[in-house]
């Protein structure tokens, strides 16, 4: 099975990262912001995999495991914060977070 060229893999990763960045800047809903962050993290993981496969190094797969574990931690903490904001303010608008005081 032929390998995907480096340029194509990095182009897909770049497009996914840019889409996640646009979603991060445009959306006001915290759930969509978290989803955009996940897309950006997966795009960076894809770039590591493509680069590691191109140069036949296992470092890309190691970084992929690191990125996936960081994404899981970010998702769990983000969803916990999202639930607390929804219980307190009954909205998922990101501007409600600025009203939160300790």
From Swiss-Prot:
Any single Pfam family the record assigns to this protein: Oxidored_q2
GO CC list: NADH dehydrogenase complex; plasma membrane
Catalyzed reactions: a quinone + NADH + 5 H(+)(in) = a quinol + NAD(+) + 4 H(+)(out)
Cellular location(s): Cell inner membrane
GO process terms (BP): ATP synthesis coupled electron transport
Keywords: Cell inner membrane, Cell membrane, Membrane, NAD, Quinone, Translocase, Transmembrane, Transmembrane helix, Transport, Ubiquinone
Membrane topology: Multi-pass membrane protein
Family under the similarity heading: Belongs to the complex I subunit 4L family.
PANTHER family, A to Z: NADH-UBIQUINONE OXIDOREDUCTASE CHAIN 4L (PTHR11434:SF16), NADH-UBIQUINONE OXIDOREDUCTASE SUBUNIT ND4L (PTHR11434)
Protein name according to UniProt: NADH-quinone oxidoreductase subunit K
Species this chain originates from: Pseudomonas fluorescens (strain Pf0-1)
